Curated annotation (Swiss-Prot):
InterPro entries: G_TrmE, GTP-bd, GTP-bd_TrmE_N, GTPase_MnmE, MnmE_dom2, MnmE_helical, P-loop_NTPase, Small_GTP-bd. GO terms for biological process: tRNA methylation; tRNA wobble uridine modification. It comes from Clostridium botulinum (strain Loch Maree / Type A3). Residues 223-383 form the TrmE-type G domain. Disulfide bonds: none annotated. This is tRNA modification GTPase MnmE. Mg(2+) binds at S237, T258. It is an enzyme of class 3 (hydrolase). Its cofactor is K(+). The lineage of its organism: Bacteria, Bacillati, Bacillota, Clostridia, Eubacteriales. Keywords: Cytoplasm, GTP-binding, Hydrolase, Magnesium, Metal-binding, Nucleotide-binding, Potassium, tRNA processing. The keyword Metal-binding applies. (6S)-5-formyl-5,6,7,8-tetrahydrofolate binds at R23, E88, R127, K461. Exhibits a very high intrinsic GTPase hydrolysis rate. Involved in the addition of a carboxymethylaminomethyl (cmnm) group at the wobble position (U34) of certain tRNAs, forming tRNA-cmnm(5)s(2)U34. GO terms for molecular function: GTP binding; GTPase activity; metal ion binding.
């Protein structure tokens, strides 16, 4: 275990609440807390047992005045989150008592922790690897049960085990190649280029299985960025309100009511969906509305999915066709809204013929008709209908990139072997593939990148 100074930070959100928790970790953590703690009947923390709590008060050192009534818990390293001696002070929730206790801890020798420093210490002390550390922040930011379960599996080390299994297989190939090249006179089992290629193809299949689910994983982690577009007054804001079951967007009969972008998260069977309601796209002389239209177009560029809404009670016109042309390179669903106002089936069929889309849904948002069909369509477009909660899903873009680079190096090694170049040259590519996978667990990652990853964490974590 590495030696560090003693750090402290508030582990709960700032503001009023039932309790606040101040965390302190490091070799001197027990001594520091003991110096400002006064137990019932003047009992100190000198004899506190690990993994127990003690009731008492935190006092101001100089004045000896009581700051707050507290419960102190003690976790002895290495059996703690950071693998160091760690204490947590539970005080009354509120800004003043929390700040005063934190100030006393710092005055007594602790240093204010940097964002993510507690988790970083757990990583540096070998209690967790980097993929498990990143899973901690994914758990905190989870928006659905499914995204949380996926993050929990990663935190438990499921991804790490799979990555380490592949890396161990790679290192065995490298070791065998190097032994064959360096000690040709020894009685070693001969390793041929053909045998290495077979092993590498099996490794690539394993990597492919992880990569194939990574797009789904990105959505679980960040949410499916879904943008509702269409001309003014086709029902975009009504759709947003219906999906979130709340009157978030203003709905009127006046075209152009929505002039800015409205964003909300919804949960479709565990899949987090970021729904973006945009200003109606049309030619306008209104300066403010023009800005809204430009923002709408920017949001379309960023979208994973576009829901293109049309009004069934009106004929398709040039503006509709322009929007259709603008979104043609995106994944999109066409929503034919206001079914309740359309009585002409021939006109409805004409609409469908005009549209170049496999995914056309007829709705009446006003009557909540067609919304379940829309949700099923979204699931089928991105997740083939469902995601099983027990599946290992790569949710991190950094991990996805490392897997892709590792795969490319394996393919390069196969090409080298196919050209019948000396097998020891192929070992360079295999070692690169091994190194890229090590970036996922943090075994072969640059220290600056590690610092950047932990800087994205919140204070106290």
């Amino acid at each position: 275990m590495k030696e560090f100074d003693t750090i402290t930070a508030v582990a709960t959100p700032v503001g009023e609440g039932g309790i606040s928790i101040i965390r302190i970790s490091g070799d001197k953590s027990l001594d520091i807390v003991s110096s400002i703690f006064k137990g019932k009947n003047d009992r100190s923390l000198d004899d506190i047992k690990p993994y127990s709590m003690r009731y008492g008060f935190i006092i101001e050192k100089e004045s000896k005045e009581i700051i707050d009534e507290v419960l102190v818990s003690y976790m002895k390293g290495p059996r703690s989150f950071t693998a160091e001696d760690t204490l947590e002070i539970n005080c009354h929730g509120g800004v003043i008592p929390t700040k005063k206790i934190l100030k006393e801890l710092i005055k007594s020798g602790a240093r204010l922790a940097e964002p993510g420093e507690f988790t970083k210490r757990a990583f540096l002390n070998g209690r967790i690897d980097l993929s498990q550390a990143e899973a901690v922040i994914d758990i905190i930011r989870s928006k659905t049960d499914l995204s949380m379960k996926s993050a929990l599996k990663q935190a438990e080390g499921t991804l790490s085990k799979e990555i380490n299994s592949i890396r161990n297989r790679m290192i065995k190939i490298i070791a065998h190649i190097e032994a064959t090249v360096d000690y040709p006179e020894d009685d070693l089992e001969e390793i041929t280029g053909q045998k290495i290629k077979v092993d590498l193809k099996e490794i690539i299949n394993k990597i492919d299985n992880l990569i194939s689910a990574s797009e789904e994983g990105k959505i679980l982690r960040e949410g499916l960025n879904t943008v509702i577009v269409g001309k003014p007054n086709v029902g975009k804001s009504s759709l947003l309100n219906a999906l979130i079951n709340e009157n978030k967007a203003i709905v009127t009969e006046i075209p152009g009511t929505t002039r800015d972008v409205i964003e909300e998260y919804i949960n479709i069977d565990g899949i987090p969906i970021k729904i973006v309601d945009t200003a109606g796209i049309r030619e306008t002389e209104d300066v403010v509305e023009k800005i809204g239209v430009e923002k709408s177009k920017e949001k379309i560029d960023e979208a994973d999915l576009v829901i293109f809404m049309l009004d069934l009670s009106r004929k398709i016109d040039e503006e509709d066709i322009e929007i259709m042309d603008f979104i043609k390179n995106k994944k999109y669903i066409v929503l034919l809204n206001k079914l309740d106002l359309n009585k002409d089936l021939n006109e409805e069929n004409h609409f469908i013929k005009e549209l170049d889309s496999k995914y056309i849904i007829k709705t009446s948002v006003k009557n909540n008709s067609g919304l379940n069909e829309l949700k099923e369509c979204i699931k089928n477009l991105f997740f083939s209908g469902e995601i099983k909660s027990d599946e290992l899903i790569v949710t991190n873009a950094r991990h996805q990139e490392a897997l892709i680079r590792s795969r490319e190096s394996c393919i390069q090694a196969i090409e080298t072997l196919s050209d019948e170049i000396s097998i020891d040259l192929a070992s360079i590519d295999i070692r690169n593939a091994w190194k890229y996978l090590g970036e996922i667990t943090g075994d072969t990652l640059d220290e600056n990148i590690i610092d950047k990853i932990f800087s994205e964490f919140c204070l106290g974590k």
